[in-house]
């Protein structure tokens, strides 16, 4: 699957509802998750209800990024689908690619990824917070 979003992708067949989560998407942003499946399977929607995914490419709109991440986790664990992508869609129709940002999931090691907040010692070498309190030193 490519990084750009194809809005003509088929959506899963719903056997429930989204709980009214997408009503505000006309004035606010919404999120889309896309994935490819080898066969049709029934899955649980994070907003409640179930849907039947199509064989091939699928596109599902959700109101929150967390809902897309929850569905992605379900696709990864239950159906062994690793090629899902998450996009933010603005009211003007512009789509922004969100996840996985550099092509590798955050829990995997990527040689090009720079660590954030990495400290080059183990936890036993940390300073005692009581000794540096009110000294304007940082303990991390």
From Swiss-Prot:
It comes from the Eukaryota. SUPFAM superfamilies: Photosystem I subunit PsaD. It is found in: Plastid, Chloroplast thylakoid membrane. Keywords: Chloroplast, Membrane, Photosynthesis, Photosystem I, Plastid, Thylakoid. It holds the Pfam family PsaD. InterPro entries: PsaD, PsaD_sf. It is a peripheral membrane protein. One of its GO terms (cellular component) is photosystem I reaction center. GO terms for biological process: photosynthesis. PsaD can form complexes with ferredoxin and ferredoxin-oxidoreductase in photosystem I (PS I) reaction center. Belongs to the PsaD family. This is Photosystem I reaction center subunit II. The lineage of its organism: Eukaryota, Rhodophyta, Bangiophyceae, Cyanidiales, Cyanidiaceae. The gene is psaD.
